[in-house]
């Protein structure tokens, strides 16, 4: 399996991004036990722009954990773009956009799975981000916002056309 030029082998083991779990120490342990590709905790675009310590700390990467991706989330397109450029400075192997987080405090603002209510905006910001950064962009999302709006088929095709290198699908809706 490959993500852009990153060869992950035949049956790669991924460490998913998990808030307050996949910090640098945990990623180190997971790499020791065979993780082929890892992601940071998700990083708030707003937090990066405000230069919040907690957000900046999540950008600290080690060559020992490669390949590694930085996952970002946010609800304002310009903030997501700026955050992606800031994340790129940390030299990740990929930048992942979180369009799947179901937490109310995230989704109700239009971030995470909240983007599933605006698929055109979701695809547009993805396309802009792919063009803006020099590393592969991946996306994590869900089947749709709810059972009445399963959009993953059309969304996956549109995201592929937007230039993403890989898509992770959480196999259920937000609700």
Predicted features along the sequence, with ranges:
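Glycine-rich, positively charged N-terminal anion/phosphate-binding segment
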Residues: 2-4, 9, 18-93
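A general structural-boundary detector
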Residues: 13, 17, 109-112
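Short beta-strand/loop segments at the ligand-binding rim of alpha/beta enzyme cores
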Residues: 8-13, 66-69, 132-143
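Alpha/beta enzyme core
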Residues: 32, 78-111, 115, 119-175
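Low-complexity, compositionally biased segments
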Residues: 10, 23-26, 99-101, 127
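Short, flexible loop segments at the rims of nucleotide/cofactor-binding pockets, characterized by
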Residues: 14-17, 73, 145, 175
């Amino acid at each position: 399996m490959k993500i852009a030029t990153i060869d992950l082998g035949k049956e790669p083991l991924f460490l998913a991004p998990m808030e307050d779990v996949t910090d640098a120490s945990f990623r180190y342990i997971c790499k020791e036990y065979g993780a082929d590709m890892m992601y940071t905790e998700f990083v708030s675009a707003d937090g990066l722009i405000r230069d919040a310590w907690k957000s900046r700390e999540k950008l600290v990467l080690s060559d020992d954990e490669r390949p590694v991706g930085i996952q970002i989330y946010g609800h304002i397109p310009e903030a997501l773009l700026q955050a992606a450029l800031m994340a790129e400075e940390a030299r990740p192997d990929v930048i992942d956009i979180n369009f799947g987080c179901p937490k109310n405090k995230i989704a109700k603002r239009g971030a995470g799975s909240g983007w599933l209510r605006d698929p055109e905006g979701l695809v547009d910001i993805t396309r802009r981000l792919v063009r803006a950064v020099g590393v592969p962009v991946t996306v994590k999302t869900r089947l749709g916002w709810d059972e009445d709006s399963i959009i993953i088929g059309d969304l996956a095709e549109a995201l592929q056309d937007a230039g993403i290198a890989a898509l992770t699908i959480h196999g259920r809706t937000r609700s």
